[in-house]
């Protein structure tokens, strides 16, 4: 298991414990089993390796038969598309879109902090518009069931878990601008974007505005603004105060 995944697992457990919802819990590396005070049981997997449709069905079948709700959370940098991508779903994504109300979950790590967020697969068919949601509120963890009737391979009623309301695919609630809004704007991002979105935007803008590649006389100044915004946002995600 990667060190970052260990950090994410530790952060996940502590965050759920802090809600007061957990009665008992057990962890085994990237797998975390919680019994909630509501009586529900949730098994969360932090996924850092390729997951096949057969793997998904195995976990869903085994856990559902035991009355345990399953939640997969994926290493975002490796497995999940960037925000606003128009993306042809891989087989495992399409399978989870079918059973999880067109929602995946991702995690990112910065320093000793970890961040968990939904990834919405907007649209219909195999090609979807990707939309990263706001960071999850651990107090909203819940179990629910999803019945699949139209897909023979996935047919059945599955015990699942997620954050927020049972119907996840909805726009995030409006909120006031944060003090970091101007730095997100420099990178061409909406306020409070995810760390993954920040990294992707920085890489794209660095390729476009780096003085070694861009002959524009203002490229050096623009690149300095981009670097400053990126460093301040990273400092925020890592839990330090930027100067």
Q: Where are the regions that the model predicts?
A:
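Long C-terminal interaction/binding lobes of large macromolecular proteins
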Residues: 68-167, 178-179, 184-187
